[in-house]
Amino acid sequence: LKKTVVNEAVTNGLNPNVPMNDSGVEWLGKIPAHWTTIKLRQILHPFSEKNHPELPLLSVVRERGVIIRDVEDKESNHNFIPDDLSGYKMVKKGQFAMNKMKAWQGSYGISNYTGIVSPAYFIFDVDFENLEYFHYAIRSKVYVNFFAQASDGIRVGQWDLSINKMKEIPFIVPPEDEQKAIVEYIPVAFAKYDNAITKLTEEVETLHELRNKLISDVVTGQIDVRDIEVPDFEYVEETEDTSDVDELDEDVEANDEEV
């Protein structure tokens, strides 16, 4: 649900009544007529600096972007960390870090930290005024699909992002005031969904408590059910419906950190 909120906001805007034009890109479809598109090569500029082993080790989590890696968490750290980190790449706060092997999964984002990452990562300076908008937009589903198209490999788990193909990916640019409005709108929309889920969870828990109390009262004789007539009913075998769970799983994936 949250991914849908972001995807709709960064491709269609917040005003459903504005004129729409065909973007000319199959993955994008129609976009607001007054928005523009540019290539990622106009925004992202490669950056490479090493020999900073004293900086904190960073990682990319699909659902959270760039985070400080907890090197003491042995359960989450599946990848080998070498003793010599001088070959690791530096990432500055505000730069764009990307795991090129898992870009098709959304393993990238604007870094809020200065640190170091695996030499296998791509690091870019970002020529875009509103970094928060860029972060929301580039991590939306539509761009994950673009990065999947720009990745090559024999098997899915070994796809490697082609930087030349990546440079040609189109990026939708709303006017600056709309970028600001979208950045302000998204967390508010997220909070509404979180509150609705919390309320629904509490209501379900209350119903379970009432159900359990009713069963307990019947079993212990506090409620006399001897004169209650049981209606005829047709037995229907229940099947497990996991569609809702699968959808929620997309928003609450495990933090599979990558280095």
Spans of model-derived segments:
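Amphipathic alpha-helical coiled-coil/heptad-repeat segments
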Residues: 1-17, 173-259
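A short beta-sheet element
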Residues: 88-89, 93-166
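Positions in alpha-helical segments
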Residues: 23-26, 38, 119-122, 132, ...
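Sequence-specific dsDNA recognition surfaces
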Residues: 24, 41-93, 239, 251-259
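Short, well-ordered beta-strand elements within core beta-sheets of diverse protein domains
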Residues: 26-30, 79-82, 122-126, 167-173
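Non-catalytic DNA-recognition/assembly elements of restriction-modification systems
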Residues: 22-53, 168, 176, 180
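A cytosolic small-molecule/anion-sensing beta-strand core signal
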Residues: 35, 92, 219
